[in-house]
């Protein structure tokens, strides 16, 4: 049996489930690149369809706590098959490597907590800029993120006025603040620049339903263009097909809702 690292997954993500989805890459072009950002060269994975007519709509894919491992790369490939230029930047690259951590608690304390939100949001701006120079249509800029990246997706929707649509998968909505994380999504409900779809699990112990309802109330009070869907039979990381938390019916429904959200709000093709 392959280990998580041999399989391309972060060690802290173990044990691996037997439900891993592997997207064929015959019709896409995918690989690694380096994106100039804030004086550094940020590693990133990108995927796009082989055949395209003009600049492509862009989806930035924001990693889980595990970094840009095989699941996130496969998300990019799935989006490429739908006609998008999908880019997943390594947002922890300055602070460390998720593969150096054997379990989730040490990964959270030893790496994730050290990454400032402000740095991440600026890095994502540079990803959008890179996309505009590499076959992407910046007028059709979207973002999606999972777990840690779901929270970042909410924050980025309040950060970048060029963003057209966002889909946040089970990202934290409320919680403690720190120097690196001065705001939570509930604090920026009044500042959203783009419509946001939130996809959450009703059985998620790490994101209580009370916090989901608090966010809904904040969005309603702000008259924000946003929607939160809760899947009653799903827990946290229900789209993570490589983990025991995977809930296929909820994941498949969420994926279709994401694609519809992008089509509805993602902007018009540039002439």
UniProtKB/Swiss-Prot annotation:
Family stated for the protein in its record: Belongs to the dienelactone hydrolase family.
Reaction(s) catalysed by this chain's protein: 2-(5-oxo-2,5-dihydrofuran-2-ylidene)acetate + H2O = 4-oxohex-2-enedioate + H(+)
Keywords: Hydrolase
Protein known as: Putative carboxymethylenebutenolidase
Transmembrane segments annotated in the record for this chain: none
EC number: 3.1.1.45
Top-tier EC class: hydrolase
Active site (catalytic residues): 147, 204, 236
Source organism per UniProt: Escherichia coli O157:H7
Taxonomic superkingdom: Bacteria
GO MF: carboxymethylenebutenolidase activity
């Amino acid at each position: 049996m392959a280990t998580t690292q041999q399989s391309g997954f972060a060690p802290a993500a173990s044990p691996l489930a037997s439900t891993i989805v592997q997207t064929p890459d015959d019709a896409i072009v995918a690989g690694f690149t380096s994106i100039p950002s804030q004086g550094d060269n940020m590693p990133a994975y990108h995927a796009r369809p082989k055949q395209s007519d003009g600049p492509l709509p862009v989806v930035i894919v924001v990693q889980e706590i595990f970094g840009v491992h095989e699941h996130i790369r496969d998300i990019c490939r799935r989006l490429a098959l739908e006609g998008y230029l999908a880019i997943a930047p390594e947002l922890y690259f300055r602070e460390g490597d998720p593969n150096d951590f054997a379990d989730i608690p040490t990964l959270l304390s030893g790496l994730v907590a050290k990454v400032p939100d402000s740095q991440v949001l600026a890095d994502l701006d540079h990803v959008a800029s890179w996309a505009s120079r590499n076959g992407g249509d910046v007028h059709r800029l979207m973002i999606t993120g999972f777990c840690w990246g779901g929270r970042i997706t909410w924050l980025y929707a309040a950060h970048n006025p060029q963003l057209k649509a966002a889909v946040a998968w089970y990202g934290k909505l409320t919680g403690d603040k720190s120097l690196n994380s001065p705001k939570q999504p509930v604090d920026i409900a009044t500042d959203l620049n783009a419509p946001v779809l939130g996809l959450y699990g009703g059985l998620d112990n790490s994101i209580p339903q009370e916090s989901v309802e608090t966010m809904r109330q904040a969005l309603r009070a702000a008259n924000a263009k946003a929607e939160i869907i809760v899947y009653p039979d799903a827990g946290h990381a229900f789209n993570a097909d490589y983990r025991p938390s995977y809930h296929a019916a909820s994941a498949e429904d969420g994926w279709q809702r994401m694609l519809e959200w992008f089509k509805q709000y993602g902007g018009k093709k540039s002439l």
